[in-house]
Amino acid sequence: MNRRIVLLPETLTHRIAAGEVVERPASIVKELLENALDSGATDINVELERGGCGLIRVADNGSGIFAQDVTLAFARHATSKIAEFDDLYRVRSFGFRGEALASIASISRTELVTRTADDLAGMRIVVEGGNICEKTEAGCPIGTSITVSRIFDSVPVRKKFLKAEATERAYCLDVITRLSLANPEVRIRVFSKGRELCHYPATSRLSERVALVLGNADADRLQPIEGETDRVRVTGFASRPDFTCATTRQIYTFVNRRHVRDHLLNHAVMTAYRRVIEPRRYPAVVLYVDLDPADVDVNVHPAKLEVRFRQPRTVYEAVVEALSGMLRGMGQSALSLTRYGPAGTAEIGHIPQEDYESRISEALRRYSLASGSRKMMYGTGTEANPVNKKHFLAERIRGEEIHARESLLLSPAPALPQNSFHPVFADLVYLGSLWDSYLIFSVADGMLLIDQHAAHERILFEKIKKAAERNKTAVQVLLIPEILNLSRPDFERFGDVVPLLEQVGIEAEPFGGEEIIIKALPTLLAHLDPGVLVKDLIAECADRGGGLSLQEKGEKIYAYLACRGAVKAGQKLIREEVAQLCRDLDATPFAATCPHGRPVYVLYPLKDIERMFRRR
């Protein structure tokens, strides 16, 4: 059906535009805080009710708004930050479009009280749904206080998409955390339900603000970074290779003190760390990139979270070099830290191109040694000169390996109904392993490679899931309970995660302030650091659990625990362990892939192998 083109009413266009700027209460907190910082404030108080869904109030001691400009402040595209197009390429303020207050006021009730140093009295204005309701003089201190309530009342559809109160509060605290890292010289306090949630005192030392935000325990494992070219200056703090996180949530990137989510910067960080930390783990980094405003375009994203660099290669190389310099300064050369041992989870795709020749040579050398000393018999699965297994285990098993091995050799395979899964793996002829990561088997019509980490990961996932669903998870009480200090956003998220933690055998509860106490872990993972484990699980649910059901979030946790508990790439398995792995695979459903969807095994047909040698 054809319809005429019509001009949309102004109220509707304002609400559509507001949807680009105001996604959730945290968006409002961000815009109001940025306005306060742009006004030169050195003291900012934030108040949240119902996680920001009920009320948001931001009060500052900045320069205030002139009385004659108060009404204009709520007009769309009215701003004091720029006056002409070229100013966009010189802007250093957080805001410059003149959209924030207009967008916020169009979907809420907004009250603004402000006074400048030149005015004897302040001004109070109330705007609801984009319409001015009240405007009067008011007594108030120098600065601005903005109160936003009835959020999304005029846009009920958007209101339905809001999460639980604790989740929305955590989003708000995340925004405050990032802005506090960019502005250590400003005191920021946050209140909710009459109590102080967090307090960031003003400091001239960035390291003090970083320690306060991340926690002293994490900050102690960070190293300062610094690098400079003729166009770019890079500073900040970055973690040592032995301190990693489950997600990228601990990577904070700032361009000219503006928090951004930039793929180029994230890629530069991971490039510097790619050969010193294991795959699927991430460093903790607080990164500041400073350059001429003319060399970066901040007018790319409505929320100003993305930027575009005029010379991206220059920025990329400066970040990589600054981080690499820090790592080199610690005596951690890239080659010496390449992890393919017990702590790694390396995959073929993560082996650097320049390492292929040396790895192939080493594989051939080890193969020739094995052929000469052990005389492995092709196709028999036996050794002519078997080694002393107890001596071998005593020499090889250390740290986490022993728990992964116990889960292979001692844990019974999950019981399945008869004939529900055809046992094919136990019948395969084991030939050896490639890089102590991929198990090689001879089959009737070719060669089969099994990723030992992915296979064990799938086995453990099904065991953990089954035990959790039946409330039969084996638990080990910690001899000395672990007290863990969380960041305020993570502490808010902890309450949502507690039922899932209990389900998998982790006993933890609040311990006062922003601390929690961990009393027990699942036996399967009792060897892991309790604090790192719980932090990773909170991050896992925060980053990847949005919009998922409790069951789906539970499966995210099962997959994470299985990954941490499984044998690693680079971890040598003896024949008994390989045999047990095959038997467990036969009894495990969905054995073709790991919980993350990667293949467990790959078949190389004989005809393809013969074709490579031109026999066909």
From Swiss-Prot:
Q: Which GO terms describe its biological process?
A: mismatch repair
Instruction: Report the superkingdom from the record.
Output: Bacteria
Q: Name one GO cellular component term.
A: mismatch repair complex
Q: Which PROSITE patterns match?
A: DNA_MISMATCH_REPAIR_1
Instruction: Name the Pfam families for this protein.
Output: DNA_mis_repair (PF01119), HATPase_c_3 (PF13589), MutL_C (PF08676)
List UniProt keywords, sorted A-Z: DNA damage, DNA repair
* InterPro entries in the cross-refs: DNA_mismatch_repair_CS (IPR014762), DNA_mismatch_repair_MutL (IPR020667), DNA_mismatch_S5_2-like (IPR013507), HATPase_C_sf (IPR036890), MutL/Mlh/PMS (IPR002099), MutL/Mlh/Pms-like (IPR038973), MutL_C (IPR014790), MutL_C_dimsub (IPR042120)
The entry lists its GO molecular-function terms as: ATP binding; ATP hydrolysis activity; ATP-dependent DNA damage sensor activity; mismatched DNA binding
Which HAMAP family does the entry mention? DNA_mis_repair (MF_00149)
Q: Which family does it belong to?
A: Belongs to the DNA mismatch repair MutL/HexB family.
Note the NCBIfam families from the entry: mutl (TIGR00585)
Q: What does this protein do?
A: This protein is involved in the repair of mismatches in DNA. It is required for dam-dependent methyl-directed DNA mismatch repair. May act as a 'molecular matchmaker', a protein that promotes the formation of a stable complex between two or more DNA-binding proteins in an ATP-dependent manner without itself being part of a final effector complex.
Protein name, please? DNA mismatch repair protein MutL
User: Source species, please?
Assistant: Syntrophus aciditrophicus (strain SB)
